[in-house]
Amino acid sequence: MSHDWTDNRKNLMLFAGRAHPELAEQVAKELDVHVTSQDAREFANGEIFVRFHESVRGCDAFVLQSCPAPVNRWLMEQLIMIDALKRGSAKRITAVMPFYPYARQDKKHRGREPISARLIADLLKTAGADRIVTVDLHTDQIQGFFDGPVDHMRGQNLLTGYIRDNYPDGNMVVVSPDSGRVRIAEKWADALGGVPLAFIHKTRDPRVPNQVVSNRVVGDVAGRTCVLIDDMIDTGGTIAGAVALLHNDGAGDVIIAATHGVLSDPAAQRLASCGAREVIVTNTLPIGEDKRFPQLTVLSIAPLLASTIRAVFENGSVTGLFDGDA
């Protein structure tokens, strides 16, 4: 790739935290740039130190950090990197967050609870971020929490493209894991050729994390290949329960597709044994060998992130990269 797109009046610099170096290198390769060298380490008490090895004055900085477990460690590292760039006189700082942490805490379910997703946005702004690039937020309203531009990218085109190429049979139905994601499921159904929809009616106890009671399937899934979608898979309990419900209703193959593979224990074991034909996620988060299983397919989100970074750098349109809301 040439540097024809580079605006000589500015200097694009890519910075990466230590949480997901493989993704950072993939993005750098797509952009034909290098990840800026830095010294990042912990002191004995766990405090994080970061120093960049070259001048950042006047640069257009993109700070890439995923937030797998331990989430707070990697989030704090990104905040410290942003602060260092601000104090080093970077011209503009964009926080590239493939997976936005604390996104499930986007509203108060009961009294005396925090809205942690808003707090994260405030912390990023205070640290010095001018802009956020992220992928498939848990809810769209989080875009409004940040006082600045938010480029909310979608993994849908990547995932639906893979499904179209590998499952050409038209006898398919898109299944939303709950009624709240039906609008997104409609977009999936259109992308897969106008296939029908179904959804899982479920209840959740807000006092018990990672626990959902799946009740019944609404829609006709008998004999069909079911594409069960979600934004993330954490412990896998919800999605595994949904697979069982679909099979009980006579579904054929069940394909699970989600953007974020959090895969907290015991997700790998649950997904491997739940009866799904394939589990498709992207690499917004690192997925170690201990979390992999035969049915798992991991697609690279790097081309989408790189295209977004390039568009932001050129002050171009991000909306043209996908059919979304950026």
From Swiss-Prot:
Record note on temperature dependence: Thermostable.
KW Cell cycle (keyword) present: no
Record has Cell inner membrane as a keyword: no
Pathway: Metabolic intermediate biosynthesis; 5-phospho-alpha-D-ribose 1-diphosphate biosynthesis; 5-phospho-alpha-D-ribose 1-diphosphate from D-ribose 5-phosphate (route I): step 1/1; Cell wall biogenesis; cell wall polysaccharide biosynthesis
Binding sites annotated in the UniProt record for Mg(2+) 2: D178
Keywords, alphabetical: Allosteric enzyme, ATP-binding, Cell wall biogenesis/degradation, Cytoplasm, Isopeptide bond, Kinase, Magnesium, Manganese, Metal-binding, Nucleotide biosynthesis, Nucleotide-binding, Transferase, Ubl conjugation
Compartments where located: Cytoplasm
Activity vs pH: Optimum pH is close to 8. Activities at pH 7 and pH 9.5 are 57% and 70% of the maximal activity, respectively.
Active site annotation, chain numbering: K202
Cofactor names: Mg(2+)
Example GO BP: 5-phosphoribose 1-diphosphate biosynthetic process
Superkingdom field: Bacteria
Entry GO CC: cytoplasm; peptidoglycan-based cell wall; plasma membrane; ribose phosphate diphosphokinase complex
Binding residues for ATP: N45, G46, E47, R104, Q105
Family (UniProt): Belongs to the ribose-phosphate pyrophosphokinase family. Class I subfamily.
Record's subunit section: Homohexamer.
Function statement: Involved in the biosynthesis of the central metabolite phospho-alpha-D-ribosyl-1-pyrophosphate (PRPP) and of the decaprenylphosphoryl-arabinose (DPA), an essential precursor for the mycobacterial cell wall biosynthesis. Catalyzes the transfer of pyrophosphoryl group from ATP to 1-hydroxyl of ribose-5-phosphate (Rib-5-P) to yield phosphoribosyl diphosphate (PRPP) and AMP. It can also use GTP, CTP and UTP as diphosphoryl donors.
Protein name, as recorded: Ribose-phosphate pyrophosphokinase
Native organism: Mycobacterium tuberculosis (strain ATCC 25618 / H37Rv)
Lineage, uppermost ranks: Bacteria, Bacillati, Actinomycetota, Actinomycetes, Mycobacteriales
